[in-house]
């Protein structure tokens, strides 16, 4: 393999495959192509999640594969044919078989949106907010057979603002920082300077997927806990309660600690831009709501649609 001379070190071109999906996978691929990295293949899902990567790979003359599952036999065959030296996981929701990890000669690296070993698992951003963390970040780590357990290559921190949601934290910070971090990680590997720092398992946390099993609002809880749950579930899956046998999801939350003599879940006010709901230790203010599988709507439209009035209570059927 040809070596490219640089003033202070030798940089070896690396054959790279990228496994990913969505805007993040596409942006990582785009960033590496702009740096003229030797991307020899991409793998993305066959549905719309993989369209962006597929289109960019096709435009760039790169082999692209769209398997149903990464454990499909043809994926391993493609890996072997491509002879990658490095595999990059850029937003992967499928399980990567251990067999694939043995193919790239330098290994496989993965982006994870938390400061590992804290918040291992598929919905780390949600849980950082739900748990009330004030700082988080992202980790790029060397993949092993565990779930987010491999040695750390690179970490960057970011502050969680008091009004951040999962959406704002990801799109305004962790997404762009993660793309830059992947580029930096590849450069470190090329220079032979990429560390492999073992994770401290004694500090590890692992949470289940943030879905409707954990997204139900309990208005009996302290105001901060309710506030963090709604922020952490915004935009997905949407923290919810019930009203007249309908599932109501909350977005655009604010909190106002105070002493208030109202029942938990009681509607305090309905205004053009907000609904205020009593909780333990104050009121929370909701800017957008969604009924069952409908669209997000404003407070007044919502109240009319379900015949909600001041004094009614959420969470009572």
Please identify what each model-predicted range represents.
Residues 3-237, 269, 282-285, 291, ...:
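One-carbon transfer enzymes
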